[in-house]
Amino acid sequence: MNNARPIRRALLSVSDKTGILEFAQALHAQGVELLSTGGTARLLADNGVPVIEVSDYTGHPEIMDGRVKTLHPKVHGGILARRGIDEIVMEQNNIKPIDLVAVNLYPFAATVAAEGCTLADAIENIDIGGPTMVRSTAKNHKDTTIIVNANDYGRVIAEMQANQGSTTLETRFDLAIAAFEHTAAYDGMIANYFGTKVPAHSKDECHEDSKFPRTYNTQLVKKQDLRYGENSHQTAAFYVDTHLDEASVATAVQLQGKALSYNNIADTDSALECVKEFDEPACVIVKHANPCGVAIGENLLEAYNRAFQTDPTSAFGGIIAFNGELDAATASAIVERQFVEVIIAPKVSQAARDVIAAKANVRVLECGQWASKTTSLDYKRVNGGLLLQDRDQGMVGIDDVKVVSKRQPTASEMKDLMFCWKVAKFVKSNAIVYAKNSMTIGVGAGQMSRVYSAKVAGIKAADEGLEVQDSVMASDAFFPFRDGIDAAAEAGISCIIQPGGSIRDEEIIAAADEHGMAMVFTGMRHFRH
């Protein structure tokens, strides 16, 4: 059975005019009759492309300031007509078949993102006729072709040129899927926006918009199927949010290496987000979602060497992230010293790429340089639901902390405290981090009691022959008892940074004073589960 359908009449009505003129010219060259509306029709006519206004075709003018343009039986009848079935009805009602529709919708997302956008502004940018045409055409994809993305114009023209002016069912079905995805995302954005306005029309005029709508809609696009999930008996895929434009594992370009695994992606995300916290040349090495070595250096090579020194054993098979351009010297040091799963950096020099190319399995990602932090949400799946929260972008500086001990931290201790606090934010709770001279000395992660995390950090440092004496310690949450302070003092810690807020804070501070330690409170917790 021949599933090719010729394109003889097309309706073009787009908000984003990118590529539409060239597309219309190509359709006209193939003998396609063009219908259009408003600004799109004017653009085509002004450039010499023959076009029929939809209002002339329907015999009904655009009304209500353009709110009603294409909602007419001659439009939707022409789109929805089943070829070989509805011809008599079409003839009785003077309806002509419309074989292709190219539509993109009012820019609702851009409108509501603009500063000063009102509810009235948002309402006027809710497209009605566009989504209706899109859904009608997609529903009847057996006979009609829908395009919602300008990137598909060339594809359709190429197929028409190769098939005597026709499109194939395979292409029409693929485009129909894209169309339904498009309208679903569009309606989801509108529902989310309106959901944050509850109760916009209540009697209580004093209310703030909610960040969390009463129903939450999102659309993620599959980037790749994964070999398996967290474990080999689990299937998995990687989906990305195409609306977020920031340097991330989701937007990174893979330059070489084997396909990323589920665990690679999760660990790379942890490493990259951690290294973003630092302005100086920095390196973060992650294993099983926890930093096992973090350091700052005069350059990336020094930062890597120092980060690796923290825990060479755990660094084996780890993920390495940098906050600057990866150079050949640093790349050489990595591949000569250790087995590495993934290397990610804002940029990778050609010389570095040439060095790593000898290790064909090493995955190398280039994510681009990041700017300011982007506001977004974190998701956590629970059985039967989804937890949403602000992404933890909180961070304190020297001017934000409060010294609560008798002894003041020295300038070098305070610098290490700030470094250590940034690392602790990315260690699984209960998190304890030892650091000295902007380098992690020991990391205690994921213990059920805070004192044991402190002990683990000390054990890790001792195992690697690192000197803990006069190091600083960060704790992601307050100490419920003084035992964690005592353990730190026994290990040689000189200064502690922690949120504070325990009912036993006075006892904790007294313990620090007893050991001659300095202690600062941040007033901010960084649990990570």
Swiss-Prot record:
GO terms, molecular function: IMP cyclohydrolase activity; phosphoribosylaminoimidazolecarboxamide formyltransferase activity
Pathway: Purine metabolism; IMP biosynthesis via de novo pathway; 5-formamido-1-(5-phospho-D-ribosyl)imidazole-4-carboxamide from 5-amino-1-(5-phospho-D-ribosyl)imidazole-4-carboxamide (10-formyl THF route): step 1/1; Purine metabolism; IMP biosynthesis via de novo pathway; IMP from 5-formamido-1-(5-phospho-D-ribosyl)imidazole-4-carboxamide: step 1/1
A cellular component term, taken from the record's GO annotations: cytosol
Protein's UniProt keywords contain Transferase: yes
Keyword Hydrolase (UniProt): yes
GO biological process: 'de novo' IMP biosynthetic process
Domain notes: The IMP cyclohydrolase activity resides in the N-terminal region.
Matches recorded under HAMAP family: PurH (MF_00139)
Protein name (record): Bifunctional purine biosynthesis protein PurH
Phylogenetic classification of the source organism: Bacteria, Pseudomonadati, Pseudomonadota, Gammaproteobacteria, Alteromonadales
Underlying gene: purH
